[in-house]
Regions:
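ATP/Mg2+ or Mg2+-diphosphate-binding catalytic cores
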Residues: 470-493, 503-545
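Contiguous mid-protein beta-loop-alpha structural module that forms a pocket-lining wall or clamp
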Residues: 2-11, 57-65, 75
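Short Lys/Arg-enriched alpha/beta "domain-start" segment
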Residues: 11-56
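Short glycine-rich, low-complexity/disordered patches
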Residues: 49-60, 140-154, 358-362
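Conserved ATP-binding subdomain of kinase catalytic cores across diverse folds
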Residues: 64-68, 73-351, 400-402, 406-491, ...
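Conserved catalytic-loop position in the HRD/HxD motif
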Residues: 397
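Terminal low-complexity segments of carbohydrate-biosynthetic enzymes
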Residues: 1-25, 522, 531-545
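An alpha-helical support segment within catalytic cores of ATP-dependent transferases
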Residues: 154-162, 346-392
Length: 545
């Protein structure tokens, strides 16, 4: 039993049911009370619940499965959350019924009495017995034909269960560390389709033997007539020193501190064009003196791993989900519809939030509104008949936060795709340069976040820091791009020639920056200067090329 007393003040009385726990989800009365009176109050406060911006209408139990250990019966419940705004989302919730003595947690869903037995409904992942059961089911999976299927990856050795614990802060999924060597990610938000994270992770490990992402070890799925739902993904726990976002913030902070330490004159720093490719020995010595050599070597390594990921994702000719494909009319219609809708949405948000902006952000916002016709035209100018490169499955949500630092190397993770996109859209084959553009936007963010978060630390005005930041950004892009194109083309990945590469990068960067603009305007308007600067520099590039 845990030390903390359970907080029963939230509940006046336990919910009383005639049914026993083992038959609970076959009992209409239990299901009705559970999905309304019990669950609604609980779910809206969970970190993984994605409907906070909408109004919950009702929750429905759409399916369930039973799974038992030696001592306990657990239910895996599939929920459909319906919203007043006329859409729905699906969630997975594993449930346990425990007496107070058996509880491993003080986070309870509700006190209940089942067939005269007192106890508590809890999220089963809080119970060690359940976590151990999942581990053993994956290790000993026999590929049975039951509704819930456990798969043991061919790289998973038989192991004894030793320990399990939650991994860090709970986000949109819940991750459990086993034996300090494995991670099981439980997907809370689920889709009636294979999760791309599972699909790509297994493909990269078992088909391509790709070494720069965590090894696929196993999975949990539910097999329904409508399709297979991925509930869990087990991977190796990669030794690391944190993510590349944290690493880059520290590096950029050091670089900005050097401005003062080394008495660097910002207006004398050599500038270059956006997308100008550079080998490290072509980076001017003034830039190396300011930023240091090591950051460019690390960017080279990241570019190499990114290209190797794309080569692995785009070199299978047998598995149709991963075969490279050309551009066509259908893809173009899909792309333009998606982008014109998104662009219009961002325009509306900007017009409604203009009063929150000032200074450079306001100036750039007005410039954006003045150029809306040209930007829309740029999105509509996508001519697939001129494209000679190929589309492949990509990471889809690629940024510094999706990369782990391990010594001098990097691991790439989280292949779930862009959170705002539908599951079908996440599986559409896209230009690999879309991932590259995502990383470039992340570089841009790391530079501006450093300026915003340390504004009193560097003895320069913001305008000068922005100027230095833009120069630094272009050198990061140039070194990354040189290495990426060399490695990608050397691995027979068809990304096109220079003109096409520049066009696709410009297109994807614009798409990313417009996407970010909506987020920033809604949550932190001061930061909207970051995507607005990105949009302005692409429009500038467009004017001169």
């Amino acid at each position: 039993m845990i030390d903390n007393k359970i907080n029963e003040d939230e509940f006046q009385e336990p919910f009383v049911f005639k049914t026993d726990w083992k038959n609970a989800f076959n009992d209409e009365e239990f299901v009705k009370v559970f999905s309304s009176d019990i669950l609604e109050n609980y779910i809206i406060n969970k970190r993984w619940y994605g409907g906070k911006a909408s109004t919950l209408k009702y929750i429905e139990v759409v399916d369930f499965f039973k799974i038992s250990s030696k001592d306990n019966t657990y239910f895996g419940v599939l929920l459909e959350v319906n919203f007043k705004e006329a859409f729905y989302q699906h969630y997975f919730m594993p449930l346990a019924f425990m007496s107070e003595e058996e509880l491993d947690t003080n986070t309870i869903i509700a006190p209940v009495k089942m067939n005269n037995v007192d106890g508590f409904l809890v999220d089963a992942l809080h119970q060690e017995d359940f976590r151990k059961l999942l581990f053993e089911e994956i290790i000993h999976s026999k590929g049975t034909s039951s509704k819930v299927q456990f798969h043991k990856g061919n790289k998973l050795e038989d192991k004894e269960y030793i320990s399990s614990k939650f991994m860090g802060v709970e986000q949109s999924n819940t991750s459990i560390i086993y034996n300090n060597t494995l991670v099981l990610k439980i997907f809370r938000r689920i889709y009636i389709s294979m999760n791309p994270d599972y699909e790509i992770s297994r493909f990269l490990t078992e088909r391509m033997n790709f070494k720069s992402s965590p090894e696929y070890k196993g999975s949990i799925s539910v097999i329904l007539t409508e399709g297979n739902i991925t509930l869990g993904l087990m991977q190796e726990l990669v030794p690391n020193q944190g993510d590349a976002w944290k690493f880059m913030l520290e590096e950029v902070d050091r670089i900005f501190e050097n401005l003062n330490h080394k008495k660097i004159k910002i207006n004398k720093l050599p500038d270059i064009d956006l997308f100008k490719r550079l080998k490290i020995n072509e980076v001017p010595h003034e830039i190396i003196d300011w930023a240091g050599l090591s950051i460019f070597l690390r960017i080279q390594t990241l570019a190499t791993r990114t290209a190797e990921m794309h080569i692995a994702l785009g070199s299978d000719i047998h598995e149709t989900a991963f075969t490279p494909t050309t551009y066509n009319g259908d893809y173009t219609v899909w792309l333009k519809n998606r982008l014109t809708y998104q662009f219009q949405n961002r325009l509306n948000i900007l017009e409604n939030n203009l009063h929150k902006l000032d200074g450079l952000a306001l100036e750039l916002a007005n410039q954006f509104l003045d150029h809306k016709k040209e930007i829309r035209k740029l999105f509509l100018d996508f001519d697939w008949t001129k494209m000679k490169s190929e589309r492949i499955r990509i990471h889809g949500d690629y940024h510094l936060g999706q990369v782990l630092v391990n010594g001098d190397d990097f691991y790439i993770l989280d292949f779930e795709g862009e959170p705002e996109s539908t599951i079908r859209d996440r599986k559409v084959k896209q230009p690999p340069l879309k991932d590259v553009a995502g990383m470039f936007r992340s570089f841009h963010y790391s530079i501006y976040a450093t300026i915003f978060n340390n504004k009193d630390k560097y003895p320069y005005d913001q305008k000068e820091l922005f100027q230095a930041g833009e120069i630094l950004f272009k050198y990061f892009v140039g070194v990354f791009l040189q290495t990426y194109t060399e490695v990608a083309q050397g691995g027979n990945l068809n990304i096109g020639y220079k003109k096409e590469i520049d066009f696709l990068l410009k297109y994807c960067l614009l798409e990313k920056a417009v996407y970010e603009l909506g987020y920033e305007l809604n949550s932190r308007p001061r930061w909207s200067v970051i995507p607005l600067t990105g949009i302005a520099s692409i429009m500038e590039f467009e004017k001169h090329n």
